Amino acid sequence: MAVPKKKTSKSRRDMRRSHHALKPSAYGECPNCGELKRPHHVCTSCGHYDGREVVSEDVAA
């Protein structure tokens, strides 16, 4: 069974974990209605994506 030869220092452990932090979600403005929306997602308020209406407005709202 594999066993560590030396104790991992706090510095090495923390450097390894430096990429584990949560990043804030990215949001952009919908060009159709101006509401905030996630990139590469259909706008939840107006149902538009890439300049086209993909979801009808009564379903989106």
UniProtKB/Swiss-Prot annotation:
Superkingdom of source: Bacteria
CC terms in the record's Gene Ontology section: large ribosomal subunit
Region called Disordered, residue ranges: 1-27
Presence of the UniProt keyword DNA damage in the record: no
Sample GO molecular function, one term: structural constituent of ribosome
Record field: compositional bias (Basic residues): 1-22
GO annotation, biological process: translation
Keywords: Ribonucleoprotein, Ribosomal protein
Pfam families: Ribosomal_L32p
Gene3D superfamilies: Single helix bin (1.20.5.640)
InterPro entries: Ribosomal_bL32 (IPR002677), Ribosomal_bL32_bact (IPR044957), Ribosomal_zn-bd (IPR011332)
This protein's record includes keyword Ribonucleoprotein: yes
HAMAP family: Ribosomal_bL32 (MF_00340)
Protein family: Belongs to the bacterial ribosomal protein bL32 family.
Name the record gives this protein: Large ribosomal subunit protein bL32
Taxonomic source organism: Rhodospirillum rubrum (strain ATCC 11170 / ATH 1.1.1 / DSM 467 / LMG 4362 / NCIMB 8255 / S1)
Classification lineage: Bacteria, Pseudomonadati, Pseudomonadota, Alphaproteobacteria, Rhodospirillales
